[in-house]
Amino acid sequence: MASNVRTRFAPSPTGYLHIGGARTALFSWAFARRHGGTFILRIEDTDVARSTPAAVQAILDGMSWLGLDADEGPFYQMQRMDRYKAVIREMLAAGSAYHCYASTEELDRMREEQRARGEKPRYDGRWRPEPGKVLPAMPAGVEPVVRFRNPVEGVVAWDDLVKGRIEIANAELDDLVIARADGTPTYNFCVVVDDCDMGITHVIRGDDHVNNTPRQINILRALGAEVPLYAHLSMILGDDGTKLSKRHGAVSVMQYFDDGYLPEAVINYLARLGWSHGDDEIFTREQFVTWFDLDHITPSAAQFNTEKLNWLNAHYIKHSDDARLAADVASRLARRGVDPEAGPRLESVVALYKERVANLNELADAAELYCVAVHPSDELLAQHLTDAGRAALASLKARLADVAWEKPGLNQAIKDTMAEHSLKMPQVAIPLRVATLGVAQTPAIDAVLEVLGRERVLMRIGRYI
């Protein structure tokens, strides 16, 4: 293990922070925390056409919501252009890079001819300087790209901390463009310079980057830099076994916030996507950091299971502090245009419902019934507020006017009404639920009445008698 572990999360702001990226960030963050190291956030925004400020903010918001705090950064590649160009000049001077004047049309013809011969399309090195080689005359009016002079012999090999030994023959790699004709450096080159300058010791990222790794290793070696250790995480599949995508539901991290998930539930679930600690399924962030290592990451694809995430979320809601849940519900109600102070104390409401919901939106749905005038459906009214039901409510209202407003007294008032009208509990409780909350199913009715309060209960019953 390196004496000072330094990891990084380096998203491109061409879209929002998705679940796969969040897992990569989590594993990189946890590995640094586990070893007392440094976690760096780097925004790879060199794709100017596709990068947006909104996407950058979404990444920062997602990281903040998940509690993945960076020790350094965020660093932005667009602010490091002078550094990249300086390194390119050094490589040109050292002979590890060269100018290529081949036009786009010329390269297209080259690839077509290679395909026609049954060969893999690749740059043929026509502008690569070699001893005794005569290069073509520089064409007028053509701005050259800069290519990395990749080794032509041997293999690039690394012991991937997830996938094991990987070897790629240098003969399979052509000379990568590291600077475009307009002088802007390319992705693979910027990544290498950043990892080198920032002293990254462990690169933990998705396995869609495996093919970039041999090129990056060769550039690092050409710069005389130490090569970091690599750990490539397998992709995440949807419930149906295909690659996770929007059609599987929420894939943006902040969509999970909007959908009512707690960050600790998402963290707990992400931690189990491709990593395990025995049979432990529920654990705190602190436990995860203590237990996390790269040895227990599976090289096979992880499968996203929405039901398991929902189960975890319900668990964390059930065990969350009422005041915290009430604050979240209050903000959700406010975003709906509902005054969260128009009803009883939200702490009392969430305490009633938090063991009955799967997400915070369901909790807000329940709380809303306590804050607004409810309007039962015609079907509920016809089914439950019959003449007998209304008569029972009238008797109950009279009893509730002066009963001690606590569950024992409320329960007794309901029982006395049942006895007076020769009714069973559902024949009184369900009409009462419909009249007070507009629904037929709620927690225990005496608890509902206690939380709703005498004034609201009497007013709501009074509408139906």
UniProtKB/Swiss-Prot annotation:
This is Glutamate--tRNA ligase. It comes from Aromatoleum aromaticum (strain DSM 19018 / LMG 30748 / EbN1). Belongs to the class-I aminoacyl-tRNA synthetase family. Glutamate--tRNA ligase type 1 subfamily. Pfam families: Anticodon_2, tRNA-synt_1c. It is found in: Cytoplasm. Keywords: Aminoacyl-tRNA synthetase, ATP-binding, Cytoplasm, Ligase, Nucleotide-binding, Protein biosynthesis. CDD domains: GluRS_core. It catalyses: tRNA(Glu) + L-glutamate + ATP = L-glutamyl-tRNA(Glu) + AMP + diphosphate. It comes from the Bacteria. Monomer. Its EC number is 6.1.1.17. GO terms for biological process: glutamyl-tRNA aminoacylation. A motif ('KMSKS' region) lies at residues 243-247. The gene is gltX.
